[in-house]
Amino acid sequence: MAVAVVFGASGISGWGITKALLDAKTQNAFSKIIALTNRSLSLAESGLPDDDRLQLHSGIDLQANVDDVIAKLRERIPSIGNVTHVFYTAFSTSHTDNQLMMKASNTKMLRTMVEAMETVAPSLSFIAVQTGSNHYGILFAEVLGERFGPVPLKEDLPRLPSPLRDSLMFYAMADEMDELSRGKSWKWCDIRPDMIVGYLPRPNSHSIAESIGYYLAFHAYLTPGEEVPFPGSEAAWNAKFSLTGQGVLGNFNVHLACKNSIENGEAFNIANKPFTTWASLWPLLAGYWGLKGTAPVGHHGIPDAASWVLDNMDRVKGWEEKYSMKPGRLFKIPWRYFHWALNMPFDRYLDLTRCEQTGFQQHEEHKESFETAWKCMQEAKLLPIVDKSSTPP
């Protein structure tokens, strides 16, 4: 029976894949799921179910040399030699904004993982590598102008022109996998989600569900039942986009792993369907917290959510105590990412034809993805369970 290993299991993608692998529908597909993290993480802290098939291990640093990684895998994980399927979601992005440095670091980590797993797991047959929609240059869309797209963004779009293409780590990672897989008995695929909406046990620099959840939940505490204007720009308010629910992403990874018909190196977009706009979505998200979501207040939206939090710093402790929340999380929110995500003024939704042609038919509304993530955060005491009829504090 198949044995899976997930690299980056404490991240938003890896956590979702691990949970999907543990789901009852896949119980007969994988006899063991090995979830790997760099930093120490207990099962209780992880929020993953207590399942005999799950092995949670930490301290596997892919920035070390490959011989050290091989030695640690063999020393700490006796069952690593039985692995047949790898799900790779480990990224190093938080230490720098330099795209060239990120490309070099992440490409090296990927090569180290592949060379290590080839050595320790002779039955290796499949590697799913997560990249993302920035393969299409979303980061540079405003620079590209009319050269961006066209939308919907399809997997076979040509790469960006130089010098922009030279800084994108996803191109380098795909080229690395093509080289490493040449002539091998295993296949790999390139999975490209858009911005991922989901839960994760630790603060993350790219968690849009957490930042929007805290923004709205704290608003609901300060001004319950009132209007909350969209904090992004007017241009972003009507731009069409698609986000990717964590559960959809996890289930699609498992779906591909259980198929034998994909081509080596094939790329797949995966996202919620249909696409949406903040004009449609923001009122629904605000409504979850008993608020009335409205259009942005000005051309450029609210300038700085972090400053707004600091301006209300004296109210945070009372908010956390009222709802028995874990303290201090609000001050760790990546507001820069929140600001960027809510101010993209261009259409950028993904084409999902290819993923549907594999037989994958799970669709999820964007509102549902946020609510699923928020309920997990509420259970973990990260967000409050709000009485929407409450009076102002």
UniProtKB/Swiss-Prot annotation:
Active site positions, chain numbering: S233 (proton donor), K259 (lowers pka of active site tyr)
Transmembrane regions listed in the UniProt entry: none
EC primary class: oxidoreductase
UniProt KW keywords: NADP, Oxidoreductase, Virulence
Pathway: Mycotoxin biosynthesis
Database matches in Pfam families: PRISE
GO-annotated molecular function: oxidoreductase activity
Residues that bind NADP(+): L54, A286
Keyword set includes Cytoplasm: no
The keyword Ribosomal protein is annotated on this UniProt entry: no
E.C. designation(s): 1.-.-.-
PANTHER family: 3-OXO-DELTA(4,5)-STEROID 5-BETA-REDUCTASE, NAD-DEPENDENT EPIMERASE_DEHYDRATASE DOMAIN-CONTAINING PROTEIN
Chain's role: Short chain dehydrogenase; part of the gene cluster that mediates the biosynthesis of sirodesmin PL, an epipolythiodioxopiperazine (ETP) characterized by a disulfide bridged cyclic dipeptide and that acts as a phytotoxin which is involved in the blackleg didease of canola. SirD catalyzes the O-prenylation of L-tyrosine (L-Tyr) in the presence of dimethylallyl diphosphate (DMAPP) to yield 4-O-dimethylallyl-L-Tyr, and therefore represents probably the first pathway-specific enzyme in the biosynthesis of sirodesmin PL.
Protein family according to the UniProt entry: Belongs to the short-chain dehydrogenases/reductases (SDR) family. Highly divergent.
Name by which UniProt lists this protein: Short chain dehydrogenase sirQ
